[in-house]
A protein has these predicted regions:
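Active-site loop/lid in soluble adenylation, ligation, and acyl-transfer enzymes
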Residues: 1-50, 54, 66, 139, ...
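Active-site cofactor/substrate anionic-group-binding motifs, chiefly glycine-
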Residues: 49-75
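Residues forming anionic-ligand binding surfaces in small-molecule and nucleic-acid pockets
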Residues: 72-91, 172-191
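Contiguous, small/hydrophobic- and glycine-enriched helical/loop subdomains that border
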Residues: 79-125
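Well-ordered alpha/beta subsegment
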Residues: 102-121, 188, 192-205, 212, ...
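A contiguous pocket-lining binding segment that forms or flanks enzyme active sites
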Residues: 130-167
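Short beta-strand elements
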Residues: 138-139, 152-154, 270, 277-295
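Active-site- and interface-proximal helix/loop "cap" or "latch" segments in soluble metabolic
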Residues: 187, 280-327
Length: 327
């Protein structure tokens, strides 16, 4: 199995390398970090629905739509990427989904613990410190390969992430940022700025390579050879094009944004006989934490407060029942 320890690379190469490796049907582990900040969205997402594209343009932030799942995320040099590419028929892939995630998140947890951070796997594919998220991940199938990617977070810019998010108004954006600041953590937060800064990228890459080798077997250092570079150029011509990046999907009236495992912010628009009703609510593990309604005589079958602690399903059914009759 090859180890591609690329270090600091262009933002484009930080995504194109693992896509190209998978399209070639080659296996390996890639370790890298982007030289410039950018925003990445998941395969099933449309940037126009997820991001404030005007803000991204003003800030000079490129947008990349990847071929693996997960949500929109702000990425920069303070995050070290690990990218696993395996053939679909590899023995390590023949597991149920949760077992696969747990197996390949174990090395990331191992690195954090080696640094004195009490991290663990938060079902099904997050890494957390006492429920505070400390790594993002995404997975998918590319060509004949399964790809699992994620990061080791030195620090995370919650303000920058909140600004790139498409939000109905500043209040929603502020709420999202406040939740992130409470519910996300990083090496900087856990170890302190001085201790985190004393860790070199090379040291962290070395820890990642060592921990992943305990799962993947011997990892032989390899470089970006000519075949892989040519594949990156081919993949780049497609994936860096506006046609790929900004592919449109059916507009969604209802939206939820992930903060960490189990914790979501929801924005729901519902037509009613009196006019459009807007609902905002926060959920934890499928239960409503808080909810507010806006709109003409917006009223649910029960008092709004009675939905707190109940299931998200009950609340959304009540909202859907506001729809005008088709008779």
């Amino acid at each position: 199995m090859h180890l591609y320890r690329l270090g600091r690379v262009s933002w484009q190469d930080s995504q194109l390398a693992y896509h190209a490796l998978a399209h070639l049907g080659r296996q390996g582990l890639i370790l890298c970090s982007p030289a410039e900040p950018y925003v990445s969205v998941g395969y099933f997402q449309e940037p126009a629905q997820e991001l404030d594209l005007e803000h991204c343009r003003r800030q000079g932030l490129p947008v990349f739509r990847r071929e693996v799942g997960g949500g929109a995320v702000y990425l920069d040099q303070h995050q070290l990427f690990w990218q696993v590419v395996l053939k679909r028929d590899h023995p390590l892939v023949s597991l149920n989904r949760e077992a696969f995630y747990r197996r390949f998140l174990a090395p990331v947890v191992g690195v954090y613990r080696a640094l004195g951070v009490g991290a663990g796997v938060a079902p099904i594919n997050d890494v957390a410190v006492e429920r505070r998220r400390i790594a993002g991940t995404g997975a998918g199938e590319i060509g004949d390969c399964v790809v699992f990617v994620g990061n080791l977070m030195r620090r995370f810019d919650c303000a920058a992430m909140a600004q790139v998010l498409r939000a109905p108004d500043p209040e929603f954006r502020r709420s999202y940022q406040q939740y992130m600041e409470r519910e996300l953590t990083s090496l900087r937060h856990e170890l302190g700025d001085q201790q985190q800064a004393a860790l070199s990228d090379d040291e962290l890459y070395g820890l990642l390579a060592h921990e992943f080798a305990s799962v993947m077997g011997s990892l032989v250092p390899h470089h970006l050879d000519d075949e892989l570079r040519r594949a990156m150029e081919r993949v780049g011509r497609r994936m860096l094009s506006p046609a790929w990046t900004y592919q449109t999907r059916r507009a969604r009236l209802h939206r939820k944004v992930k903060v960490r495992a189990g914790l979501y912010l929801h924005h729901w628009l519902q037509e009613s006989p009196q006019g459009p009703v807007e609902a905002r609510f926060t959920s934890l593990d499928g239960k409503v934490l808080e909810v507010s309604l806006r709109g003409p005589v917006a009223k649910l079958p029960r008092e709004t407060s009675e939905y707190i602690g109940g299931s998200v399903t009950d609340l959304t059914k009540a909202l859907s029942a506001m729809a005008p009759s088709r008779d």
